[in-house]
């Protein structure tokens, strides 16, 4: 499913993302993955557990190629002595993997996967970031404002990409202030207020005005909080 998280400014969105992705250690409470408590001491721990995060800043290196950005920190080394001792990369294998993952998500309008990311449009960069997360995120993908600062056409393509990822069986946590997008693609909406979960609603049961009213405190939900 796609679970949206909507929050007002200063309600703890960034801290929540950092805790789930291993960037900060929670003071209390627990994180459960597949029903079991997990403890992340670094982003590497979260990634190893199958959690991938696409930050609003994308966390990409503009000067590096699409392939290099897909594998940043997870490069494939050549087999044998060249890889083990000389740390030579298996670039053909990396390029093949990158092409396959981009093609699976319909992103092969990008002709040269070795071109620098800085030459791509905003929507294409966002697509690469989502494809990278989908390639390595086996449990859940966290998307932080994926359509922010994009034009209408590029934003639409990213939404389609998110739905493609969902159709592959990968759960998505979508953090966004864009209510029309949230109500269009999400199955459930987690409403965060003053650092805590206020309620979880289904888009078909409430209006966008209701969601905003809950989020800002102008209105209190009648239903009890659903389980996460």
Predicted regions: what they are:
Residues 1-228:
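Glycine-rich phosphate-binding loops of nucleotide-dependent enzymes
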